[in-house]
Curated annotation (Swiss-Prot):
Protein's gene: ureA
One Pfam family cited in the UniProt record for this chain: Urease_gamma
Enzyme Commission identifier(s): 3.5.1.5
UniProt-listed GO biological process terms: urea catabolic process
Gene Ontology MF annotations: nickel cation binding; urease activity
Subunit structure: Heterotrimer of UreA (gamma), UreB (beta) and UreC (alpha) subunits. Three heterotrimers associate to form the active enzyme.
Record-linked InterPro entries: Urease_gamma (IPR012010), Urease_gamma/gamma-beta_su (IPR002026), Urease_gamma_sf (IPR036463), Urease_subunit (IPR050069)
Lineage: Bacteria, Pseudomonadati, Pseudomonadota, Gammaproteobacteria, Pseudomonadales
Positions in coiled-coil regions: none
Record's catalysed reaction(s): urea + 2 H2O + H(+) = hydrogencarbonate + 2 NH4(+)
NCBIfam families: PRK13241.1, urease_gam
Name of protein: Urease subunit gamma
Family matches, as HAMAP family: Urease_gamma
Family membership: Belongs to the urease gamma subunit family.
Listed GO CC annotations: cytoplasm
């Protein structure tokens, strides 16, 4: 399998996001990289499903809350930016204050 660097990045984000989902399901609090991966992977999948940028910007704020992450993590993530592929091209999705 010959993947481009962009495809490798997406695969890495997805894998890290899947690991974060499993840890969250076991009741563990997520650390910084896990929280970013979970949200980023969900945004990429949402774009693949055909959601709009505006929908994803809102959706990104609903995925995690303070009780699901380690202390200090929400303050470390003021925003998350993901370059996602939509049916009409690649767009930058920015989620401000993703963990409320």
């Amino acid at each position: 399998m010959d993947l481009s660097p962009r495809e490798k990045d997406k695969l890495l984000i997805f894998t890290a996001g899947l690991l974060a989902e499993r840890r969250l399901a076991r009741g563990l609090k997520l650390n910084y990289p896990e929280a970013v991966a979970l949200i980023s992977a969900a945004l990429l999948e949402g774009a693949r499903d055909g959601r709009s940028v505006a929908e994803l910007m809102h959706y990104g704020t609903t995925l995690l809350n303070r009780e699901q992450v380690m202390e200090g993590v929400p303050e470390m993530i003021p925003d998350i930016q993901v370059e996602a592929t939509f049916p009409d091209g690649t767009k930058l999705v920015t989620v401000h204050q993703p963990i409320a």
